[in-house]
Amino acid sequence: MSVAANAELMDYDDVIARFDPVLGLEVHVELSTVTKMFCGCTTAFGAEPNTQVCPVCLGLPGSLPVLNQAAVESAIRIGLALNCEIVPWCRFARKNYFYPDMPKNYQISQYDEPIAINGYLEAPLDDGTTWRVDIERAHMEEDTGKLTHIGSETGRIHGATTSLIDYNRAGVPLIEIVTKPIVGAGERAPQIARAYVTALRDLLRALGVSDVRMDQGSMRCDANVSLKPIGTAEFGTRTETKNVNSLKSVEVAVRYEMQRQAAVLASGGRITQETRHFHEAGYTSPGRVKETAEDYRYFPEPDLEPVAPSRELVERLRLTIPELPWLSRKRIQQEWGVSDEVMRDLVNAGAVDLVIETVKHGAPSEQARAWWGNFLVQKANEANIGLDELNISPAQVAAVIALVDEGKLSNKLARQVVEGVLAGEGEPDQVMNARGLELVRDDSVTQAAVDEALAANPDVAEKIRGGKIAAAGAIVGAVMKATRGQADAARVRELVLAACGQG
């Protein structure tokens, strides 16, 4: 990513030589419940604006919230998976502020009494090691409405002529997961931030509590960054970069803020405690001066009883926690017999779960890995999308592999079939038939092509007859070209050698 042309940044190596970064990550996750946090409105994504609302989520006078028990259970499962203590008693609070995204002028959240506290998550790093990130708390709250600003170059409110509000998202259940300060990371701080959010995404996906689609806003990361001079104990003033919407952007935003803040401090300036916006070009810009807890005038929510999860409920939910993704991957790596480097490449490409699903449909793991880890990664990169966003399913990849194993396709022809599936031309066998790609398995047809190629290249044929077996490659190439790659190259070679008395 490029950065703003007028950005004043310190060289990254100089930053690390002079400062220690301190990170704090706040991740908001929309839960995959059927209804909202405090009312019966659906949480389905993508509906027409303001069609999934009611008096509760619109904050109309006299409406009262009713707590979604499924959201509470999801919060407990998340806390358990993050090695948190599930408290025996917690309650909601009103976070008071005036902004159009919440029409009742307060958000129901949890302030000083969250449902889960004091956990940790081991984040796998690129070099095969892990970094333990301590979790301060995970608390429940409701999401806000979505504002769309019209007329500004940046899509933000500054310079906009019109702002549109969609309250469909208002009241959707959220879990906010807040880390304790991450210190001692040094030059690896940006990588650790990305690794933590990646590990958290994978964990939540394995739990089935959220679709964790950062591109759709169901998982959002706020990155707090501050610097302190090497050797000092006191933390610096932090900034909070809001709503970073991709894993790579988390890393870029943290690195940028480290370089920007270092340049400000080195020039004698002071860091302003503020929120900042992340831009896809790779830089941040000022938002608003950061509020403190006192600004929000928190007080206990009077319309909701405290939440007191029983020990029996917690233990029952503990039994539903699946194998952690990184442990599952280690086991799978051993089953597949691949190196740490190969496994990291598959993980970084987002291919592991897709390979597993392909194997479930009958494909050998080696071939499934080859397709998802090579050709399909290239196609995803060309389209600038995630691997799981490609227009092909694990079942379809398994079907292509089966066609190769059955001798109906070569690997080269199989790639053409996959391209057809990606283009929406149908199932693999339909694409193969429609494009006429099935391998020629009739020896009489192949033999005729071999005879024609030998007749057209008498000098090469004579070399083969004289014992220069390597020369057969030229004839095989001519036959493959004549048959548009639909002949079996190994069988063509056999027929060429036999025709020249070398079989």
UniProtKB/Swiss-Prot annotation:
GO terms for biological process: glutaminyl-tRNAGln biosynthesis via transamidation; translation. Keywords: ATP-binding, Ligase, Nucleotide-binding, Protein biosynthesis. It catalyses: L-glutamyl-tRNA(Gln) + L-glutamine + ATP + H2O = L-glutaminyl-tRNA(Gln) + L-glutamate + ADP + phosphate + H(+); L-aspartyl-tRNA(Asn) + L-glutamine + ATP + H2O = L-asparaginyl-tRNA(Asn) + L-glutamate + ADP + phosphate + 2 H(+). Disulfide bonds: none annotated. InterPro entries: Asn/Gln-tRNA_amidoTrfase_suB/E (IPR017959), Asn/Gln-tRNA_Trfase_suB/E_cat (IPR006075), Asn/Gln_amidotransferase (IPR018027), Asn/Gln_tRNA_amidoTrase-B-like (IPR003789), GatB (IPR004413), GatB_Yqey_C_2 (IPR023168), Gln-tRNA_amidoTrfase_suB_CS (IPR017958), Gln_synth/guanido_kin_cat_dom (IPR014746). GO terms for molecular function: asparaginyl-tRNA synthase (glutamine-hydrolyzing) activity; ATP binding; glutaminyl-tRNA synthase (glutamine-hydrolyzing) activity. Its EC number is 6.3.5.-. It is an enzyme of class 6 (ligase). It comes from the Bacteria. Allows the formation of correctly charged Asn-tRNA(Asn) or Gln-tRNA(Gln) through the transamidation of misacylated Asp-tRNA(Asn) or Glu-tRNA(Gln) in organisms which lack either or both of asparaginyl-tRNA or glutaminyl-tRNA synthetases. The reaction takes place in the presence of glutamine and ATP through an activated phospho-Asp-tRNA(Asn) or phospho-Glu-tRNA(Gln). Belongs to the GatB/GatE family. GatB subfamily. Heterotrimer of A, B and C subunits. HAMAP family: GatB. This is Aspartyl/glutamyl-tRNA(Asn/Gln) amidotransferase subunit B. It comes from Mycolicibacterium paratuberculosis (strain ATCC BAA-968 / K-10).
